[in-house]
Amino acid sequence: MVKRQQSLFRAIHLVCIQLVGIPSLAQFQNRPTYDTTMTAGIRYRAELSGVVSTNGRSPFWMRSNQFGTVPWQFPAGIGTVGVTGLWGNPRQAHKPYLKAGIEVVGNLNSASRLVLPEAYVAVRLGHGELYIGRQKEIHGLVDTLLTSGSIAWSGNAVPITQIRLGTRDFAPLKFTKGLIAVNAFFSHGWFSDTDSMHNVMLHAKAVFVRVGKPTWKVRFYGGINHFAQWGGYSKALADGPVSKFLSANGYLPSSLKAYKSVVWPIGQPGSDDQFSAIDTINQIGNHLGSIDAGLDIQLKNASLFLYSQHIFEDNSGLTFKNFPDGLFGVRWKAGVSNSGAVVQLKQLTAEFITTRNRSGTKLPYGRDDYFFHGQYLDGWTHQGAIIGTPIFTRTADLPSALLKKSAWLSRSFAYRLLPVNNNDVQSVHVGAYAVLFQRVSAVLLATGSRYYEFDYSARTYDQLSMSLELTNLVLSGSVNMGLKLAYDTGAIFTGNLGGMLTIRKTGFLTQKPVNR
C-alpha cells in the first residue's frame, strides 16, 4: 500500500525553517564513535577477519549495524583498509580545516564483493561541516555504542552517497548564553541502483535542540529526522498491472517542482504529465522518519540518558495515532574511575521496541506497513540491507520454509513480495560494556523479540540473539586482535553459532600534532 503523507508535515517544516534560519546551524549526525581526531596527518587502519558459523549464515549480531560490511554467507574472509587524513587545526574554531577518508572492505565467500562504506571529503569550520561522499552515520537520539539500532537510520546498511551541509555536534546559540544548542543538517543523496529501481534519490534533513548548559545536571533534547526517497525509474512499474496508477511509464517525479514537494511535503502537487495518479493524491516520494526526545541526568559518579524515538511514515504517525510505536531506551554510564579492578563496568543500556499499534487495522489511515512503499519496490533499504532498525527483516533474508507457511510473511503488492515484511514486533534489548584488565574492551548484546502476524492470525515467532565481542587484545605495538561470538535461536533464525577473529593494525603514514 502506498504510504499516506499529508499536510501535518506543515508543522514540522515550519519548525525546521525557523531553526535553519539561524546562522550558527548546520548538520545533525550522530556517529557510532565521535570524531575526536586532533592530530594532523594521515592515519591508516588495516584488518583481516575470518568468520565461521554452524549453519553457513551470519548470526544476527555478527552482521547487524555493521554498515553492510559483514556478509550473509559463511565461512568468509573479510579484509578492510581505511585511510583518514586531517589537514588543519580542529582546535582553532575560527579557521577551516579539511578532513577526508576512504574505507574499502572485501568479502571473500560464495558471493564475494567489494563494499565502500566510507569515501568522503569534508570542510569543517567550528561546529559546521560541508561534506561530499559517504560517511558512517547513525541518526537520532540513541546510545550509539550498545543500541539495537536507531529506528529510522541505524548504521545497518552501506551508507548513501550525499552532499550535506550541517553541524557535527550541538552548536550553542550565543544569544541564549549556551542555554540552547542546535544540531541540524540538510542533504541530497543518491541510492545505489538495483534490479528493481534506478536513479532513486535521497532527501534528508533533521533539527535537534538541546536545552540546558553543558555544566547542568539535567539537560533536555528533542528533534525530528525526515528522510525521503524520490525520483527514479523502474521497468517493473512500467510493465506492472497497476503501472499507470503508480508511475508515468515507469518514471517517478524528479523535476524541480517534484523536489520542492519532497522538501516541503504540504498538500498534493496537482495534475502534471510527470505525476502518476497516486502522486496527485499523495505526497511525492516515500517519506519516513522519527520524532525523538531525550533526557540527560548527571549523577554523583555516573550519568543516565533516557530517550525515545517515535516512528512515522505518514500523517497518522505525525499525529501519534500509531503511538507507542517506536523505540524507548535508557543508558547508564559510569563516571571516570581510577580503579585498578580486573573488571570495570562502564556502561549499561536497555531498550524496548514496539510496532504493534500501526495506527489501527482500518484503512485508509491504519495498517501502517513500516519501510514499505508501493512505488519504491526495494523499500527502505540500501544495497541489500535495511537502513533503519535491523529488528525488522527483509523477505529475501527469511528461510523459504517460513515464507511458505505464513500468508503474512509472504504478502505481496502488485504481484510482488514485500521487500520488508517482518515488521510487526516487540523486542527487549540489553547491552553492557566493560573494560577487562584495564585494556580489553568487552561488549555484550542480547535481544529477545516476538514477531506477530498483525491481524492475519494469532501466530507469533520468538527470536533470541546474543553476542560477545572482545577488542584491544594487544599482540604487539600497533597490532591488536579482536574476537566475537554470536548466537541465534528461535523461529526466524534457527540455532546458529558464529565466530569472528580479527587482526588489526593502525598507525600514521604522516603525523603532525597541532597546537591549541
Regions picked out by a protein language model, each given a short descriptive name:
Residues 1-32, 516:
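Bacterial Sec-dependent N-terminal signal peptides
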Residues 28-79, 90-102, 182-188:
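Transmembrane beta-strand segments of Gram-negative outer membrane beta-barrel proteins
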Residues 28-44, 85-99, 124-128, 170-182, ...:
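Short loop/turn motifs that connect adjacent beta-strands in outer-membrane beta-barrel proteins
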Residues 48-56, 87, 104-108, 125-127, ...:
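Transmembrane beta-strands of outer-membrane beta-barrel pores
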Residues 56-63, 111-115, 142-149, 193-202, ...:
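Outer-membrane beta-barrel translocator domains and adjoining extracellular loop/strand segments
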Residues 99-191, 211-230:
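Outer membrane beta-barrel
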Residues 168-364, 428, 446-450:
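Signature for the C-terminal beta-barrel architecture of outer-membrane proteins
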Residues 278-291, 296-516:
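Outer-membrane beta-barrel pore domains
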